[in-house]
Amino acid sequence: MKLAYWMYAGPAHIGTLRIASSFKKVHAIMHAPLGDDYFNVMRSMLERDRDFTPVTASVVDRHVLARGSQEKVVENITRKDREESPDLVILTPTCTSSILQEDLQNFVSRASIETEADVLLADVNHYRVNELQAGDRTLEQIVTFYMEKAKSNNQVLTQKTKTPSVNIIGAVSLGFHNQHDIAELKRLFQDLDIQINQIIPENASVQDLKKLPSAWFNFIPYRETGLMTARYLEKEFNMPYVDITPMGIVQTAACIRSIQQLVNALGAAVDYEKYIDEQTRFISQSAWFSRSIDCQNLTGKKAIVFGDATHAAAITRILHQEMGIHVAWCGTYCKYDEEWFKDQVQEFCDEVIVSDDHGLIGDLIAKTEPAAIFGTQMERHIGKRLNIPCGVISSPVHIQNFPLSYRPFLGYEGTNQIADLVYNSFTLGMEDHLLEIFGGHDTTEALSIGISAVDSINWSEEAQKELNKIPGFVRGKVKRNTEKFARDCSKNLITLEVMYEAKEKVSS
């Protein structure tokens, strides 16, 4: 266990609660001490939703520690069953309450005798998996439970629809631009004349899960959530799935061709090549934009990419293949998916980083000195400290990346959004310099060699004046190089002489 003040992926119970709060008429009971029960506040703040978060904390306090948890947990489950009339109640401990080593399955068995709702214990090892893995496992557990229940009652709908149809698996509460992506996928499948059978878990009913096998195939837009469910459905009901993320012109075309091949193999006769060509040339603005003089100004610019496996891999491909931007390194915090990630991106960047240590990532960014960063909320903070622009392309994110306006990352409309994000993330020409000349621009203090450096270096008045004469678009780099030289030489005050010495050293 590691003490950290920042985690890219949260603890396991957050993943379980995200899945539970995505379904309709599902209530989660969190067996946790005060301090672990922040999910309600976080979801209420971030998710653009009118409804209350369907999560109740069964607080572990001194009374519980003295008498045991069973009575309180069972009472909370039965009370919520009476008050909310849910279809399903999920009980999840947290990594803290797991220390008590209680037989929670026994609590669930006891409570289910008294409830109308089904009651499940989240089957997750809270010490071995993170938020993303736990969410994936919880979704599979719920689908498996209701499919097995329907099978035993002979209620599974295995009769395929007459026309091609799809289940979209992985629309989850608190996902990165998730609602917009799903809206774009609906539009895409409508254009392809593929009817949508089910979208799970967002706004889905557990009572409708028995209809999943009616679809021709399953579609998994994000690797982080849904793959385990798709593999279960493939194994049990022989349902194929497509897991190519349609992000960027190239990958969207690859995804559509994969769908075409699959539905034709299942008995349809479709040809989507004309649709791909029309969308690429006339609907998506990013194809011609990538050949414009504006985008050519970005050719060879250095960038770094960091995020979850799905988004980091897709953005790296887009920067390299579609925009000609040099990706110095790309990375992910999804250490469990390292093999797939490396296979996807190693051709498109100089180096692949797999780490969940934000300090290491910050130091690497400072050392690389890219022209732009594409990362999470943490990389945005790092970029502000280093005076390097950052485009946010992946969770974890803050409120500004739960926009009210339509901003998908998937599909052809998503290509326009990504092109805007990439182009606007780079500092254009002498923008900083002009802004400083005409006022209204706050200069951000930049750190020197690494984000984790804590000691400070002072500048003399003459040296600061000399630094201010340097054009803004290179000033940050000059400052960092000078401070690095001063630090290496154990100098705490930068004078004009130190500046010139640093310049000579860098030039040589």
Swiss-Prot record:
**Matches recorded under SUPFAM superfamilies:** Helical backbone' metal receptor
Sorted alphabetically, the keyword list is: 4Fe-4S, ATP-binding, Chlorophyll biosynthesis, Chloroplast, Iron, Iron-sulfur, Metal-binding, Nucleotide-binding, Oxidoreductase, Photosynthesis, Plastid
GO function terms (MF aspect): 4 iron, 4 sulfur cluster binding; ATP binding; metal ion binding; oxidoreductase activity, acting on iron-sulfur proteins as donors; oxidoreductase activity, acting on the CH-CH group of donors, iron-sulfur protein as acceptor
Q: What is its EC number?
A: 1.3.7.7
Pathway of action: Porphyrin-containing compound metabolism; chlorophyll biosynthesis (light-independent)
From which domain of life does this come?
Eukaryota
Q: Where does substrate bind?
A: 429-430
- Per the UniProt entry, what is one GO biological process? photosynthesis, dark reaction
GO cellular component, as recorded: chloroplast
The main location class comes to plastid
Cite the binding residues for [4Fe-4S] cluster: 36
Cofactor binding: number and manner: Binds 1 [4Fe-4S] cluster per heterodimer. The cluster is bound at the heterodimer interface by residues from both subunits.
Localization per Swiss-Prot or TrEMBL: Plastid, Chloroplast
Reactions catalysed: chlorophyllide a + oxidized 2[4Fe-4S]-[ferredoxin] + 2 ADP + 2 phosphate = protochlorophyllide a + reduced 2[4Fe-4S]-[ferredoxin] + 2 ATP + 2 H2O
Reported cofactor(s): [4Fe-4S] cluster
UniProt keyword annotation of Endoplasmic reticulum present: no
Give yes or no: UniProt keyword Ribosomal protein: no
Family statement drawn from the similarity comment of this UniProt entry: Belongs to the ChlB/BchB/BchZ family.
Quaternary arrangement and interactors, per the entry? Protochlorophyllide reductase is composed of three subunits; ChlL, ChlN and ChlB. Forms a heterotetramer of two ChlB and two ChlN subunits.
**Role noted for this protein:** Component of the dark-operative protochlorophyllide reductase (DPOR) that uses Mg-ATP and reduced ferredoxin to reduce ring D of protochlorophyllide (Pchlide) to form chlorophyllide a (Chlide). This reaction is light-independent. The NB-protein (ChlN-ChlB) is the catalytic component of the complex.
Q: What is this protein called?
A: Light-independent protochlorophyllide reductase subunit B
Q: Which organism is it from?
A: Pyropia yezoensis
| Gene transcribed to yield this protein | chlB
